[in-house]
Amino acid sequence: MENEKENLFCEPHKRGLMKTPLKESTTANIVLAEIQPDFGPLTTPTKPKEGSQGEPWTPTANLKMLISAVSPEIRNRDQKRGLFDNRSGLPEAKDCIHEHLSGDEFEKSQPSRKEKSLGLLCHKFLARYPNYPNPAVNNDICLDEVAEELNVERRRIYDIVNVLESLHMVSRLAKNRYTWHGRHNLNKTLGTLKSIGEENKYAEQIMMIKKKEYEQEFDFIKSYSIEDHIIKSNTGPNGHPDMCFVELPGVEFRAASVNSRKDKSLRVMSQKFVMLFLVSTPQIVSLEVAAKILIGEDHVEDLDKSKFKTKIRRLYDIANVLSSLDLIKKVHVTEERGRKPAFKWTGPEISPNTSGSSPVIHFTPSDLEVRRSSKENCAKNLFSTRGKPNFTRHPSLIKLVKSIESDRRKINSAPSSPIKTNKAESSQNSAPFPSKMAQLAAICKMQLEEQSSESRQKVKVQLARSGPCKPVAPLDPPVNAEMELTAPSLIQPLGMVPLIPSPLSSAVPLILPQAPSGPSYAIYLQPTQAHQSVTPPQGLSPTVCTTHSSKATGSKDSTDATTEKAANDTSKASASTRPGSLLPAPERQGAKSRTREPAGERGSKRASMLEDSGSKKKFKEDLKGLENVSATLFPSGYLIPLTQCSSLGAESILSGKENSSALSPNHRIYSSPIAGVIPVTSSELTAVNFPSFHVTPLKLMVSPTSVAAVPVGNSPALASSHPVPIQNPSSAIVNFTLQHLGLISPNVQLSASPGSGIVPVSPRIESVNVAPENAGTQQGRATNYDSPVPGQSQPNGQSVAVTGAQQPVPVTPKGSQLVAESFFRTPGGPTKPTSSSCMDFEGANKTSLGTLFVPQRKLEVSTEDVH
């Protein structure tokens, strides 16, 4: 048997040849009779049963089984084949024909869409059963059998049965089995539904909806009518009357789950739809009004279009079944806005049920809401059902009304538009702060003015707290000799100029020697607050007072120790290797510009030369010229870089003077006596063959009215070490910067040429005290300031004490002021001891009360040699 089965499965063609005698039909009948002597008349052989047992094992059978499981049509066809196998073989032959037909032919053979419509299907269903059946006869209905007979899906039969169940024409016995009642209880059921409809005030709802539609067409803003409370009092959370299926006495369904089935909504909707016809005065109900009442107007707004269309489709299904029962018929209502689909009641006239047997009406009990879960209540009560009653409408409304409503909505919402409000707020907020790109110059000017005003207020506070400067007797400059010093390099590189702050806000411009690659720097201060002068006590000669600032202490105290030095220029070769000089201050008309030209020799040569008697006389004349002159102190302020000049020995062009004196190549540093110490190293000077670095102190006298006309010094670079000249800055840029910073007045013009200073406007000159600045520690000597402050260690191991002098008391300058220059030289020489110098009070009685007295610290020069 196993071998036969293998042959049967593996070689079906051999099996066919063995069992099919038609292959020998070409031979004579005699031969056929010999081969098959016992066979009757020739017929088509039927499919053996063994093949059906072996089908699931073949790929074709498996594919057919999968297709039948997936496709409902094939599954239904297989079921029909199994049902009608015993009756006749015609359905099987018909199915075989459909299998061999193509797709288009198969669709043509199927019933059309009209034939499958619910109305036609309902007519066929009702034709199977009588309107008034005999109760003694079994009137059970099997839905599966009906679906097979009508050749439709079972779900289509369910739609018909649900509507008939709502009218109590059928009752449910079990799953897929119903009992047919016919029209025996139809009038009674309709009377019950009419009474319930009157209790729910469906007539008022229909009138209210029609009235609201009429008002919305002509007046959009008008709200709901006064009858809204009628609906709200009778509506549930779904927006329409919430009630269960209406049952009649004696016709209660025997199924326990009758009111909990999923298809309950269709039955309830069908009963409500019939109620609308029964309670309306003209028994014509449009589909739009029925949808608003049955589905709920708010649900029409909340639901999306797909769900709403599904609900409308359910209403059409109910209407088709009722039309098949000859209860309603489809008509069209013509109104102002066009033609609408509607249905007219054609059934029997029903009066409200007044019989003694009251119908069993199952409304939603109050305890049903209690049993409802809190989550469901929260989901239903989260949003109000009638929040926006006038905005969204049914899609079937006319476009004209929608356009009018949209226009009115735009007009009403225009004044309170959030976009316009934001723009207004942004414009108000941005009013005090305009665009920076459009108002950049004005903003910069405002910021500069605010900074200058703040600095002026700080200066006033500091001036109020400052005390008088203690006078110290000036040093008597030696007559016979001046020392020449060679300065070693300090820690700070050349060009790094730390600005030591000062209580005052005005300053004399300062130019420091720079490296060949870097520009010079000029320090400018606001001239508006430079009118501060002090009067020294009578009997003391005018000197220079330096002030130590607290901000300059700390990490830079060790580098702030400098020495005052002066020497005569004795060698032209050494002079050519030293940096250029600064421009002196502008002088008054009739006064001469006197300059002293210190000079030094290269190497470690230390020699002192006697000063001639003429220089001593000139110095005494300078001291006499200081009488009746009040000086003004200028601290350091702004550090402004200036390019270096490309030539040595530049001449100073003084404003208002034709004669100008030639300056030595040595650097002369202008500084304020209140500005403290500004150290400058000479390491870079040594790299460019600077044997020594000499500083000559100057005393400048400038009139108070022309404080803004402060001199600008030119610091020429060495042509030998820096062959490529650097261009000077534009004078327009310098003037613009200083004017906007408030450092100079608008009528003052600065010149950035190598040999010129500024052009003073006012002819009056104010006296300016310029303190000598020290460029570095001397080679072999250190200058110590006498002070009670303990000395701080220097990088070279020497102890240097820093003295902080008090600020002078400001007074008003008196009388006319003269221009004079005073030169203070470091006392002592290479052979003198450390404490050889003392204070000299000679010529003190020659100083008048109007002269500014600025005492100078006592200096001690050590004789230690540093190799």
From Swiss-Prot:
Superkingdom of this protein's organism: Eukaryota
Instruction: Give the sites modified to Phosphoserine.
Output: 71, 102, 413, 417
Q: What residue ranges does this record give for the DNA-binding region?
A: 113-182, 261-347
Subcellular localization: Nucleus
Annotated stretches, region: Disordered? 38-58, 408-432, 532-616, 771-800
Q: Write out the biased-composition intervals (Basic and acidic residues).
A: 557-567, 594-604
What induces this protein's gene, according to its Swiss-Prot or TrEMBL record? Following DNA damage. Up-regulation in response to DNA damage is not confirmed by PubMed:22802528.
Amino acid composition bias (Polar residues), ranges on this chain: 413-432, 532-556, 568-579, 775-800
Keywords in alphabetical order: Activator, Cell cycle, DNA-binding, Nucleus, Phosphoprotein, Repressor, Transcription, Transcription regulation
Task: Give the Gene3D superfamilies listed for this entry.
Answer: Winged helix-like DNA-binding domain superfamily/Winged helix DNA-binding domain
Q: What does the sequence similarity comment in the record state about its family? A: Belongs to the E2F/DP family.
Assembly description: Homodimer and heterodimer: mainly forms homodimers and, to a lesser extent, heterodimers with E2F8. Dimerization is important for DNA-binding. Interacts with HIF1A.
The record's domain comment reads: In contrast to classical members of the E2F transcription factor, atypical members contain 2 DNA-binding domains and regulate transcription in a DP-independent manner. Both DNA-binding domains are required for DNA-binding and are proposed to form an intramolecular structure that is similar to the winged helix structure of the E2F-DP heterodimer.
Q: What is this protein called?
A: Transcription factor E2F8
